[in-house]
Curated annotation (Swiss-Prot):
Belongs to the cytochrome c oxidase subunit 3 family. One of its GO terms (cellular component) is mitochondrial inner membrane. GO terms for molecular function: cytochrome-c oxidase activity. Keywords: Membrane, Mitochondrion, Mitochondrion inner membrane, Translocase, Transmembrane, Transmembrane helix. One of its GO terms (biological process) is mitochondrial electron transport, cytochrome c to oxygen. Component of the cytochrome c oxidase (complex IV, CIV), a multisubunit enzyme composed of 14 subunits. The complex is composed of a catalytic core of 3 subunits MT-CO1, MT-CO2 and MT-CO3, encoded in the mitochondrial DNA, and 11 supernumerary subunits COX4I, COX5A, COX5B, COX6A, COX6B, COX6C, COX7A, COX7B, COX7C, COX8 and NDUFA4, which are encoded in the nuclear genome. It catalyses: 4 Fe(II)-[cytochrome c] + O2 + 8 H(+)(in) = 4 Fe(III)-[cytochrome c] + 2 H2O + 4 H(+)(out). Residues 35-40, 106-128, 184-190, 257-261 are mitochondrial intermembrane. Its main location: mitochondrion. This is Cytochrome c oxidase subunit 3. It is a multi-pass membrane protein. It comes from Scyliorhinus canicula. Component of the cytochrome c oxidase, the last enzyme in the mitochondrial electron transport chain which drives oxidative phosphorylation. The respiratory chain contains 3 multisubunit complexes succinate dehydrogenase (complex II, CII), ubiquinol-cytochrome c oxidoreductase (cytochrome b-c1 complex, complex III, CIII) and cytochrome c oxidase (complex IV, CIV), that cooperate to transfer electrons derived from NADH and succinate to molecular oxygen, creating an electrochemical gradient over the inner membrane that drives transmembrane transport and the ATP synthase.
Length: 261
């Protein structure tokens, strides 16, 4: 390898942006075909290609950062800024859903019966499954912080236990949310209430699944001795993302489940 006189990582040519873009094209085309022709083949093909791209790309980044030493302090600083900007973009993504909800609920139109929830909608009790989900996510926020402290103190066993517990709580939250959707007395087609409810909570649920996957990768890396008390940005990014998911849920719970009911 040629000597470089700077601390920055000059990335090698990679096929993964191309395969990722192809997967995105297949998924959007597949979604349209599923809606109009009831065929899932193209959508599944796109999802499979996306999954393979993610696995291969993450594998390359882990190799570069863990085994090849390319993630120097300036590179880590750039990755931190990148993750912060990504989370900020996600905040604005959810802001659109909250805007739609409050736009519809603060001044209900005559078509909705002039009230919120709209006439004919039987909302979910905020003090049953939604409250349990809130407790589960808050507990997972505590366990992921516990894992971070264990990692920083070099307590490998404690970090593994806390991370495992966090993933279990994430999976439990997803299972409770799926049960709630299955038993909900309204659907996504039931006017603006059903649409805002299922789109906002559904996208949050998708983020919980992504966050749980992110943490599962971190758990595997921790088991394989990839992290040290000084060098563990992959875990830090996962923890930031998980805390963001927690905070979004609190706003969803207070707005849609509690105030909106």
């Amino acid at each position: 390898m040629a000597h470089q006189a700077h601390p920055y990582h000059m990335v090698d040519p990679s096929p993964w942006p191309l395969t990722g873009a192809t997967a995105a094209l297949l998924m959007t085309s597949g979604l349209a075909i599923w809606f109009h022709f009831h065929s899932l083949l193209l959508l599944y093909l796109g999802l499979t290609l996306l999954l393979l791209t993610m696995i291969q790309w993450w594998r390359d980044i882990i190799r570069e950062g863990t085994f090849q030493g390319h993630h120097t302090p300036p590179v880590q600083k750039g990755l931190r800024y990148g993750m912060i900007l990504f989370i900020v973009s996600e905040v604005f993504f959810f802001l659109g859903f909250f805007w739609a909800f409050y736009h519809s609920s603060l001044a209900p139109t005559p078509e909705l019966g002039g009230c919120w929830p709209p006439t004919g909608i039987n909302p979910l009790d905020p003090f049953e499954v939604p409250l349990l989900n809130t407790a589960v996510l808050l507990a997972s926020g505590v366990t992921v912080t516990w894992a971070h402290h264990g990692l920083m103190e070099g307590n490998r066993k404690e970090a593994i236990q806390a991370l495992t517990l966090t993933i279990i709580l994430g999976v439990y939250f997803t299972a409770l949310q799926a049960m709630e959707y299955y038993e909900a007395p309204f659907t996504i087609a039931d006017g603006v209430y059903g649409t805002t409810f299922f789109v906002a909570t559904g996208f949050h649920g998708l983020h919980v699944i992504i966050g749980s996957t992110f943490l599962a990768v971190c758990l595997l890396r921790q088991v394989l001795y990839h992290f040290t008390s000084e060098h563990h940005f992959g875990f830090e990014a996962a923890a930031w993302y998980w805390h963001f998911v927690d905070v979004v849920w609190l706003f969803l719970y207070v707005s849609i489940y509690w105030w909106g009911s």
